[in-house]
């Protein structure tokens, strides 16, 4: 068993996703009068590598690297600005040398009229040159880097006065050291005092300067530019920038979302000056919307720096440049989503959609949670028979967008995941006042309610409040969407319990639940959730209570992670049906609404074939859209796309 588990861990860690091309035509496009809307990342997260001016282009094009789940590098041409924000054309795939692949840390820039990519592989700096004709990078030179105890990660390169300058991110050599969530069944990320048992690891900068001759030296020694306690968990991206006043420096991102700035010193014995910070117009350090902030500069048609583009998980944003403060810190304005032409409807990463008439105008909109921790409203500007979903609008509480963050201690995988909210909303009239409320679970495993205190057609959300079980704040496995609906005369609440099994609770009142027992299959067995029943492998299922087969009894539709094994590890789905990725399962209620009992799950099929959605999870929602008879299906995936499936094309 231990050998099989190790094999499964290795397979999951190298999984790069199964093709969803068979139903790419099912992806919902964003509706906009001018066809310009939020930029949709090609993966769960992405890294901006650099921006370059193509021939005759007014604004620089952008190179973007997708993640390990969807490894690729793309070039996006900037088509212009909309309200001061850049918008981009469709991506062009870029080829890389096979020995380099698509996942190395890199930096792309223009040097003497040509486009170069510089990549870190171990303790080597590899230069590649871009070939416009076949949209590829070709390796040209290689440099061995000495003087480092550990391999560098992020890199920035630029040329001045015939010399190449290089800055490297170098870690302090410590390992995070916390327990691995797949392996440790006890999984204690915090000690008895509440402190993380691993290390808060840091990085700093090394650098070197070489003559940019036709032939590089075989090796070069990198020397420290800073101490190694500059940034926690890493810079993620280092980018050279020239400001309109002539000042030059590098901007870095960070794991936690802050931005650092290092002015260029002008002295060859030390490339950069001491650390400064990137601040907002109130001189407060900017904390990016998402985890893994990765910045590159953006220039206008006369090559003046006018802003920065920042990628991360769940989105890509633009910050306008606003000058410097008295301390020499660069100032940037409020971030806005980067834009694209004819983009897919985009909800962030690991989205959890709900089809409901949120604004009370008679058609189905969507309320959607994501890994960032936001809950967004997607208005249907069309009709149910011809839906036209507009761009995301964040839902707010007393004027501030909902942004659930676990912080230092509320994420079961440790403080390095403090920025992942993984909010999973269920929209339902919970207190029977005729208004739709929002119930959530998230990365904290905390079940909360946002009561609607507005009026019909004008929803207003109150602050989140706990739900209680036997007087204690109700807690469950993380990242599940609770299934909430009326079963018979009572409101049912289904989620996964401490055994990672499906569990029924009944509503007592607006804030209190009572135990209804574990749910069972018709053979009397409990319904387990995951191959990994401990740590971060638990939970994650997205539960929907709905009469799917139209027999008058409400069933379960469940969006699973890839390694979901419902109802048990031995034969559970979808993992044991060929390991093809996350899926949507149908559990028919063979009992009654008052006493539900379920058949063995079946996998939802589109045009006769099971549908799959990558690694982390997928989330179903249903409604009468194209179909008057029966419920159509929308599935949100880990890349933030919404897939529409008409009922007539579905089977199980």
Range-by-range predicted roles:
Residues 20-652:
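Beta-propeller-forming repeat regions
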Residues 1-22:
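Bacterial Sec-dependent N-terminal signal peptides
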């Amino acid at each position: 068993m231990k050998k099989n588990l190790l094999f499964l861990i290795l397979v999951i860690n190298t999984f790069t996703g199964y093709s969803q091309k068979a139903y790419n035509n099912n992806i919902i496009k964003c509706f906009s009068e001018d066809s310009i809307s939020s930029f949709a990342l090609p993966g769960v997260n992405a890294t901006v590598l650099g921006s370059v001016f193509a021939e005759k282009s007014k604004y620089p094009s952008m190179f973007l690297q997708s993640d390990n789940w969807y490894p690729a590098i793309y070039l996006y041409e900037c088509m212009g600005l909309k309200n001061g924000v850049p918008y981009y054309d469709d991506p062009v795939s870029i080829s890389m040398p096979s020995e380099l692949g698509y996942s190395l840390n890199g930096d792309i820039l223009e040097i003497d009229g040509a486009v170069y990519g510089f990549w870190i592989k171990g303790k080597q700096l590899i230069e590649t040159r871009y070939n416009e004709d076949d949209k590829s990078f070709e390796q040209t030179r290689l440099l061995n880097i000495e003087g480092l105890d550990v391999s560098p990660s992020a890199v920035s390169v630029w040329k001045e006065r015939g010399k190449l300058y290089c800055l490297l991110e170098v870690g302090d050599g410590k390992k995070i050291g916390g327990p691995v969530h797949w392996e440790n069944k006890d999984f204690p990320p915090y000690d008895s005092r509440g402190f993380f048992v691993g290390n808060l690891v840091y990085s700093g900068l090394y650098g070197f300067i070489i003559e940019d001759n036709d032939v590089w030296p075989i090796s070069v020694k990198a020397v420290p530019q800073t101490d190694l306690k500059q940034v926690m968990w890493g810079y993620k991206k280092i980018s050279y920038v020239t400001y309109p006043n002539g000042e030059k420096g590098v901007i870095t991102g960070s794991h936690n979302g802050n931005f650092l700035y290092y002015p260029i010193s002008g002295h060859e014995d030390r490339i950069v000056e001491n650390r400064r910070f990137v601040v907002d117009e109130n001189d407060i350090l900017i904390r990016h919307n998402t985890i893994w902030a990765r910045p590159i500069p953006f220039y206008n048609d006369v090559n003046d720096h006018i802003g920065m583009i920042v990628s991360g998980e769940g989105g890509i944003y633009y910050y306008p440049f606003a000058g410097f403060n008295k301390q020499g810190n660069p100032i940037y304005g409020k971030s806005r989503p980067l834009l694209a032409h004819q983009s897919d409807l985009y909800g962030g990463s690991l989205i959890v959609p709900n089809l409901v008439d949120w604004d009370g105008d008679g058609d189905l909109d969507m309320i959607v949670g994501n890994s960032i921790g936001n809950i967004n409203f997607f208005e249907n500007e069309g009709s149910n028979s011809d839906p036209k979903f507009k761009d995301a609008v964040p839902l707010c509480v007393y004027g501030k967008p909902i942004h659930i963050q676990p912080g230092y201690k509320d994420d079961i995988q440790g403080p390095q995941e403090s920025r992942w909210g993984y909010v999973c909303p269920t929209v339902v009239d919970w207190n029977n006042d005729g208004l739709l409320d929002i119930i959530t679970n998230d990365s904290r495993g905390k079940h909360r309610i946002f009561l609607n205190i507005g009026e019909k057609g004008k929803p207003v959300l109150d602050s989140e409040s706990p739900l209680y079980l036997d007087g204690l704040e109700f807690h469950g496995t993380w990242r599940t969407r609770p299934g909430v609906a009326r079963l018979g005369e009572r409101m049912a609440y289904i989620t996964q319990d401490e055994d990672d099994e499906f569990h029924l609770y009944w509503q007592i009142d607006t804030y209190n639940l009572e135990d209804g027992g574990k749910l069972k299959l018709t053979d009397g067995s409990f319904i387990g959730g995951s191959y990994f029943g401990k740590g971060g492998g638990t939970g994650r299922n997205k539960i929907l209570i709905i009469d799917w087969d139209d027999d008058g009894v409400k069933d379960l539709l469940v969006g699973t992670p890839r390694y979901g094994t419902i109802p048990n590890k031995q034969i559970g789905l979808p993992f044991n049906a060929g390991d093809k990725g996350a899926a949507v399962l149908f559990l028919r209620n063979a009992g009654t609404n008052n006493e539900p009992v379920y058949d063995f799950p079946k996998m939802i099929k589109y045009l006769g074939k099971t549908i799959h959605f990558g690694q982390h999870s997928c989330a179903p929602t249903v409604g009468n859209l194209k179909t008057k008879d029966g419920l159509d299906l929308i599935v949100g995936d880990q890349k933030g796309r919404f897939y529409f499936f008409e009922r007539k094309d579905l089977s199980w």
